[in-house]
Regions:
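Non-transmembrane, aqueous-exposed alpha-helical and coiled segments at domain scale
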Residues: 1-165
Length: 165
């Protein structure tokens, strides 16, 4: 079997990053990114997601090796019909690991096209960590990372984000 890469799929249109997505787990990729792709295909949205890897160890490198492409398999009923489809998802622009490249993470605040921040952070990721300060980057908790990004956006006097936790 060939490794998934941009060389073996139909070229997706170049679209700006409009979504900053915290998390690269199965739910986020098969639900949020799949929905972005469906909206892009229908002309309802014209953007991609940049994923922020929430932990130092994650799927970022694996996704990069596949040019940020992956397959979602849909099985079930749709409009009363049985479906079993495989779709290559092309709605992810990149993955940023803030533990390795904090500057790239903060640079997301500079992107005028970025409108949305989406997260599927659980209660375990939403907790106070006294070591998480703006000066102590990268922060460990989701709220602290988000605060750092929002503060950077504020410093740049850019428009706010719509945050979907």
């Amino acid at each position: 079997m060939k490794q998934l890469s941009a060389a073996i799929v139909e070229k997706a249109p170049a679209l700006p990053t409009k979504v900053i997505q915290f998390g690269e787990g199965n739910f986020m990729r098969a639900f949020i990114d799949w929905q972005l792709q469906q909206m892009n295909q229908k002309g309802l949205f014209t953007g991609k997601a940049t994923i922020v890897q929430p932990l130092s160890q994650g799927l970022g490198e694996m996704l990069k090796e596949q040019d940020y492409l992956y397959t979602v398999i849909l099985e079930g009923l749709m409009n009363g019909e049985v479906i079993n489809e495989a779709e290559i998802i092309t709605s992810v622009e990149s993955v940023i690991n803030p533990y390795e490249n904090w500057d790239a993470y903060l640079a997301l605040a500079e992107n005028d096209d970025a409108e949305f921040i989406i997260s599927n952070t659980t209660e375990a990721g939403i907790q106070y960590n006294p070591k998480d300060t703006l000066e102590n980057a990268p922060q460990q908790s989701f709220p602290a990372k988000l605060t750092a990004l929002l503060y950077r956006r504020f410093q740049l006097d850019k428009a706010g984000f719509t945050i979907i936790p």
